[in-house]
Amino acid sequence: MRVFDFDGTIYDGESLFDLYLYSARHDPKVFRYIAPVLRYAVKYKLGRATLEQMEYGVGKMTEGYLAELSRSKRVASVEQLVDDFWDRNYSRIKPWYQPESDDVILTASFGLTVGEACRRLGVRNLVASEVDVGTMKVTYLNFSTNKAKRFRELYGPDAVVDEFYTDSKFDQPMIDMARHAFMVKGNTITQVK
């Protein structure tokens, strides 16, 4: 099986950040959630935030953001906003990525957002951060070591990862698990294992 990180790997950018910007065009009130989430994201990328800090900080900010959107009179629904976002941004899926039936997308982004991209790609296997759409509460953040842990919970301890693709050294637990691993920068793919 092939396993892919999503943001920066097969998607050119950070989809959650891009969705924030897209949604702010529809309801500028959500701008107040962008700076705190960016701060946590930068700390995480630099290795300066613990998983617990990410879970608390990003979880709380995301809950506020999603609740604000779901109450907004300018947005039909969060699901419709996500669908419209992918109508506009689906072309940012990198051209080298050709989906296969058993591919797994393993991402820190939310299933609520990346799930629509996976549906359009024909990818059925998504391991992502989770939100209860009824309450808009974050129920699971798929960051850092949680990625490998969650992958093993869902696919079992004996699941064989033939190839793993990422843009981040923070995915080292998945790199270690894979038979072959690749680092992606732009459209350049370099085998690292």
Language model region names:
Residues 1-49:
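Active-site neighborhood of HAD-like aspartate-dependent phosphohydrolases
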Residues 2-9, 24-25, 60-65, 81-85, ...:
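Short, functional N-terminal and low-complexity linear motifs
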Residues 7, 46-49, 66-70, 85, ...:
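A general boundary/transition motif marking the beginning of the first structured unit of a protein
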Residues 12-16, 35-38, 47-54, 69-74, ...:
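Short, mixed-charge, low-aromatic patches
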Residues 25-26, 44, 48, 64, ...:
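A structural signal for alpha-helix termini and helix-coil/disorder junctions
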Residues 54-92:
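Metal-dependent phosphoesterase signature
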Residues 80-193:
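C-terminal cap/substrate-recognition subdomain and adjoining C-terminal extension
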